[in-house]
Amino acid sequence: MARLAAFDMDGTLLMPDHHLGEKTLSTLARLRERDITLTFATGRHALEMQHILGALSLDAYLITGNGTRVHSLEGELLHRDDLPADVAELVLYQQWDTRASMHIFNDDGWFTGKENPALLQAFVYSGFRYQIIDVKKMPLGSVTKICFCGDHDDLTRLQIQLYEALGERAHLCFSATDCLEVLPVGCNKGAVLTVLTQHLGLSLRDCMAFGDAMNDREMLGSVGSGFIMGNAMPQLRAELPHLPVIGHCRNQAVSHYLTHWLDYPHLPYSPE
C-alpha cells in the first residue's frame, strides 16, 4: 500500500477547463481517510496553490515551481532553490530568436513584460495572474524560474539557443508542449520528492505519482508506482515506456484509477 500520492496538476488532476472535478475531490478525500499523504507537484506558484488548498480545505504538501519550493501542511518552507543571478541575468537580457513570451517567477509572484490575456485561461480556477513589469529591472537574486510560452517548434529552436548559452548552468524542460522552463541545475519534481520523503521518514518506494509532461519524468521514474496520463506528451511515454498509461484528464482518469485501487486492490485495472 502506497503511503504518499504525488500529483501533477495541469493535464493530470485538472480537467481541460482547468478545474478539479467532483470525482477527483471525492477521491482525494478518500485517500486522506486512509492516511495517505497528499502532495501536489506542479509548475504553478506556491501562492496560487496555497490559495487553492485553503479554498478546498485540503491538507497536502506542496512541490511548486517544478521543484523550486517545497512547503509543509502548515505552509512552512521545507526546501528552496533559485536560479543563480548570472543565469537569470543572461536569460532576461539576451536577445533570443523567438516569438515566445517570457515569464519570470519569484516568491512575490509571476511577472512578464506584456499583456497576454490568453494565458490567464489556465488560471480561471484560482484567479492567479501575472504582474506587468520592465523585465530589465527585475531583481536577479531571487528568481526561481523563467518560462517561455509559445509554439512548440519555436520553443524547440529556443531550447537549442538556451543550451548553447547556458551549458550545464541550468536545467531546461518542457512542462507542456507550449511551455519551456529554465530551472536551477538539478531542480525537478523527482529530486525534491526525495527531499520530502526523507523529511517524512518515507522512501520513494512508498510513493505513487501521476503526470503528463516532461517535467514529471524524474518523479514518475523514481517512485514505486508511476502512472502516465493518456493525454501525456509523446516524449514522456517514449522516455518511460515501462510505466502504465491510464486515461485522459478530461475523464478524471486519476480518480478513476484510484477508485479502483482503493476498492479492488487485487484486481487488474483497465482505463476503459
From Swiss-Prot:
Reaction it catalyzes: 4-amino-2-methyl-5-(diphosphooxymethyl)pyrimidine + H2O = 4-amino-2-methyl-5-(phosphooxymethyl)pyrimidine + phosphate + H(+)
Amino acids binding Mg(2+): 8, 10, 212
Keyword line: Hydrolase, Magnesium, Metal-binding
InterPro entries named in the record: Cof (IPR000150), HAD-like_sf (IPR036412), HAD-SF_hydro_IIB (IPR006379), HAD_sf (IPR023214), HMP-PP_phosphatase (IPR023938)
EC number per UniProt: 3.6.1.-
Cofactor: Mg(2+)
The keyword Nucleotide-binding belongs to this UniProt entry's keyword annotation: no
Claim: Repressor is one of the keywords in the record: no
Gene Ontology MF terms: 4-amino-5-hydroxymethyl-2-methylpyrimidine diphosphatase activity; magnesium ion binding; phosphatase activity
Similarity comment: family membership: Belongs to the HAD-like hydrolase superfamily. Cof family.
Job description of the protein: Catalyzes the hydrolysis of 4-amino-2-methyl-5-hydroxymethylpyrimidine pyrophosphate (HMP-PP) to 4-amino-2-methyl-5-hydroxymethylpyrimidine phosphate (HMP-P).
Protein name per the record: HMP-PP phosphatase
Organism listed in the record: Escherichia coli O81 (strain ED1a)
